[in-house]
Amino acid sequence: LLVYTFLLGLIWNLLTKTSPAHDSYNILSGSQQFAINDYTPLMPENDYFYDYPFQLGYAFVGEIIIRIFGDNAYFILQLLNILASVGISASLITFAILIFKKRKTVNFTILFLFGCIQPILFTTFHYGNLLGFSLSLWAMVFTCVYLKNRKKRFIIFSAVFISAGIICKSNSLIILTAICIILILDFLKTHKLANITAILISVIMGIGLNQLIIFQYEQRADVSLGGGVPKILWLDMGLQETSDPNRPGWYNPEYTVIRYNSMNKDEKAAADSGIRDIKKRISKLISSPAERANFFATKTLSQWNDPLYMSIWVSSTRGAREEPGSFVKSMYSGNAGILTENYANFYQSFIFLFASAGMLVILKRRNIRRNSFIAVLPLIFIGGFLYHLFFEAMPQYNVTYFTLFIPIAAFGFSECCEKYHDSLIGFIKYKFRKSKTKSEESV
């Protein structure tokens, strides 16, 4: 499976040859200049890193890769995405072992991961989504291993991986929160003080290292970047309608960077403006139940109704180092793309169906619910789901969260096979005998 995932990702990247664009272009252009000790992107006349200083985490990764690999850096970053996709698959298999402890469930997890093409197609995107998620999932794996054997070195492994995940993508704070919740729940049962130590180390390293990277760039460039666009503005944006009624809460710079810059980058004034907006919007949603239901239902559907989670879109809307071939063009806007989307639609429905069955079995069986790790995958998913329900929405953010359903779907499928095995075999035998009888009568 891991070799298959790597090779498929490698082939797709070699075929598409995409280049950075939009945010990834701004970030990696900065990385290129930082690599030659040119800090022009951090000067006051260049807004990007003043608006989004948290992006300096991935810029730091890009700078290191560019310093080492030079002109091949963009492909190496895609290679890291491919390895991240491999890492996600490996972590999900590990979770299947830790949580369900059944060979059939593990085997079905591996089988279903063979069909999960969305993260593989997403590897062309020069951004920290996959890398951050993979590193953070492994941080959770190490947390679970620590809780299982109480060996404290796994606390350090977890803290290092979650810190690296947050550096690559700030959304990894969602998994840091899940790690803290799991450790607190275990502490309430066991009263192990090492859990509190683990939380402190993870939080300090997870948040502190990213801030340290920003600080070192400020020192190198002799500037002060400030906090950037206040996070409250992203909540304001996530609660607003957009010009497209089918995409409420999607990215709209009017509520974030445009407002921030219109107030001369005054963080307090921008935040206060956002809070006033949020209060008005919440008041309106509370007073109109129909509008509230329609807004959040439409926002949820707009994120989850794309079975590919924009994994082809992130390639098709960006430039390429070379003219793409006929197959890639067909994937972008032809029959190959239609077939791929139809397959992804079936696969997504299949996973959701059996993940639902798996959750029903988990809720019914007390012995499974007692497993300390049973809440891990649902907790991460719920954190991501709620975050994007209220903040910025886009299907591409869910390409990683979707994979969390796979081990649960494998468990659900395994349980269904065991429960209905005899009935299914009996039905097949009955149909076979009936068919045989008809053929004999016709003779």
Where are these regions (language model features)?
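Extracytoplasmic catalytic/substrate-binding loops of multi-pass membrane glycan-assembly enzymes
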Residues: T16-Q32, I36-I65, D71-N72, A270-G274
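Membrane-proximal stem/loop segments at transmembrane-domain junctions that anchor or position
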Residues: T40-P41, E218-E322
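Loop-to-helix entry region of an early transmembrane alpha helix in multi-pass inner-membrane enzymes
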Residues: Y52, L56-F60, I68-G87, E341-N345
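Membrane-interface anchor segments at the N-terminal boundary of transmembrane helices
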Residues: F75-I76, L80-N81, T298-F381
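Transmembrane-helix motifs of polytopic, lipid-linked glycan transferases
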Residues: L79-K101, W138, A357
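Transmembrane-helix signature of polytopic, membrane-embedded enzymes
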Residues: L92-G115, R370-A375
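Short acidic/glycine- and proline-prone juxtamembrane loop motifs at membrane-interface regions
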Residues: L121-G132
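Membrane-interface alpha helices of multi-pass inner-membrane proteins
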Residues: F154-K169, I179, S202-G206, G383
